[in-house]
């Protein structure tokens, strides 16, 4: 899972993959778009948005 740009449905799919059964915030906290779509984010950073 390399650092990558993740926007829209790709971001949601990545969150499902990373968070699994824990789930994630339905409305992600502010910052995930800036971090992962405008910038790049890692799997470790995505885990911060899991429940």
From Swiss-Prot:
GO biological process: cellular response to oxygen-containing compound; glucose metabolic process
One GO cellular component term: extracellular space
One family name in Pfam for this protein: Insulin
Molecular function terms from GO: hormone activity
PROSITE patterns (UniProt xref): INSULIN
Leader sequence segment: none
Assembly and binders: Heterodimer of a B chain and an A chain linked by two disulfide bonds.
Protein family (similarity comment): Belongs to the insulin family.
Protein name (Swiss-Prot/TrEMBL): Insulin
Lineage, uppermost ranks: Eukaryota, Metazoa, Chordata, Craniata, Vertebrata
